[in-house]
Amino acid sequence: MSEHSHDNKPGELEESRLVVDNDFEVAPVNDRLFGSFVEHLGRCVYDGIYEPGHPEADEDGFRKDVIELVKELGATTIRYPGGNFVSGYRWEDGVGPRDERPRRLDLAWHSTETNQFGLHEMAKWLEKTGGNELMEAVNLGTRGLEEALDLLEYANIPGGTKLSEERRANGADQPFGIKMWCLGNEMDGPWQTGHKSAEDYGTLAASVAAGMRAIDPNVELVVCGSSSHVMDTFGKWEETVLEKTFDNVNFVSCHAYYHPELQPDGTRDMKSFLASGVDMDGFINDVAAAIDATKARLKSKHDVFISFDEWNVWYLNEEPSKNPEGIGNWPVAPRLLEDVYSAADAVVFGDLMITLLKNADRVHAASLAQLVNVIAPIMTEPGGPAWRQTTFYPFSLTAKLAKGGTVLEPKLASGTYETDKYGEVPTINSVAVRGEDGTISVFVVNRSMEAANDFAIKLPEGFALSAVEAQTLHEDDLLAKNTLEDQNRVVLHPNTTITSDADTGTVRVTLPPVSWTAVHVK
């Protein structure tokens, strides 16, 4: 539902309403929606999760302070090792004795890869972070079928073959049991090492999928969708690739990044940026339509879901994203893509999480790109501290409250506002999740830059309301950030405006302009 658009004077209070009904469900919340991504890029691995010699390093060189923050974040599935990096990666370089591992050029990020961290280290690190699931990507850029099958044999076969016995000799007696595999990365992107046409990639992915299933029928495979919604190849790529792979894959990937675009006058288009969830929602709907069209055309009974395995706010092509250059300049773990996120970025980030939850019937996996230092919720300094970026907070609280729950059909009445990029959009975006214990969690974002919003939640009939609480991320200074010098500048605060009426089953809370709020009702 949508109400008429109107311009607000600063300080004016808008109104919106969410009706929560237990009888209308979207889908269970898949734990994989709270995945993240570790790529050999910049300081994500080296000086990020792995820093031997750091005061907080354990016996394996893993930073214990980072491990604790990853646990607090609530990330689940971890996609690894790329990303663009994987399209030139030789997995066997990263196994075996460390002093025998080769140093290689990484063409994706113009860096040197030392290979001191590889598959075994990743598996061991994931055990320490709480047993997170590993989502492994195979190289379909410079490599193909044989190398992918070798990696699967090495990782998942218990023993008795050359490669499985090599794994055991390298210290992993039991197989890694990796279920989820990405068949390459962004293969329609001209920047991708080994970039391919849809025809060529679809044919290769189909053969790799069939071969992998011959080794391990229980693998879950992610085929590359187009690199983004705005690619010229988008749509036609999905149609061609899915036509060739449909019955042998489980997911098609989506990738999307958002930032406030610079205007000719030097300002940024904040109103459009704050509505980024609208674009993500349209992207998901378009990919779902491509899946459905292919399924109908093939008369298939098989279901393919979306793995939104790269999403975030990213100031793409701006200064922190510039690669090293020059034939003699291939640094190890340079500072790359180290965006420092603002309060406004965190609000948009929370909006994107709401959008993923609203589409939980189609999106069964998602990976926040990335986890540490590289466009990440966690930052570190070599030899120094680790801290939470602004985006850490909406992710961790959403994961805490939504895991194991069921998304309920959003019935939302909201005003609208005008944007240059997306036209008229709802001022409020919200979703409700019913927990396993029957409690209700509502996540809501106020996109308005001018007006606070009186947000009413109508609870399900017969809900025995006993307690309510709300936490809000909001700063009057939209550009406020958490930095090495001021690590807790932007945090969640209790929203003391929350009230409840058990007789009418209504909860009300005032949402400040440009804010993200989580309401928990029990």
Curated annotation (Swiss-Prot):
Catalytic activities: Hydrolysis of terminal non-reducing alpha-L-arabinofuranoside residues in alpha-L-arabinosides; (20S)-ginsenoside Rc + H2O = L-arabinofuranose + (20S)-ginsenoside Rd
Keyword Hydrolase listed: yes
Q: Which GO terms describe its molecular function?
A: alpha-L-arabinofuranosidase activity
Please give the activity regulation comment for this entry: Completely inhibited by Cu(2+) and partially inhibited by Co(2+) and Ba(2+).
Which family, according to UniProt?
A: Belongs to the glycosyl hydrolase 51 family.
The family database entries (Gene3D superfamilies) matched by this protein are listed as: Glycosidases (3.20.20.80), Golgi alpha-mannosidase II (2.60.40.1180)
Classify the source by domain of life. Answer: Bacteria
In the UniProt record, what gene is named as encoding this protein? afuB
- Role summary: Catalyzes the hydrolysis of p-nitrophenyl-alpha-L-arabinofuranoside (pNP-alphaL-Af) and the hydrolysis of the terminal alpha-L-arabinofuranoside at the C20 position of ginsenoside Rc to produce ginsenoside Rd. Cannot hydrolyze p-nitrophenyl-alpha-L-arabinopyranoside (pNP-alphaL-Ap) and ginsenoside Rb2.
The pH response of activity is noted as: Optimum pH is 4.7.
Recite the lineage of the species: Bacteria, Bacillati, Actinomycetota, Actinomycetes, Bifidobacteriales
Q: Subunit comment for this entry?
A: Homohexamer; trimer of dimers.
Site Important for substrate recognition — annotated at W314, Q370
Judged by the first EC level, this protein's enzyme class is hydrolase
User: Could you tell me the Gene Ontology terms of the biological process aspect for this record?
Assistant: L-arabinose metabolic process; polysaccharide catabolic process
**Notes on temperature effects:** Optimum temperature is 57 degrees Celsius.
Which Pfam families does UniProt cross-reference here? Alpha-L-AF_C (PF06964)
Q: Where, by residue number, does alpha-L-arabinofuranose bind?
A: E39, N84, N185, Y257, E310, Q370
Q: What is its EC number?
A: 3.2.1.55
Key words of the record: Carbohydrate metabolism, Glycosidase, Hydrolase
User: Mind telling me what this protein is named?
Assistant: Exo-alpha-(1->6)-L-arabinofuranosidase
Q: Record keywords: Hydrolase included?
A: yes
List the source organism: Bifidobacterium longum
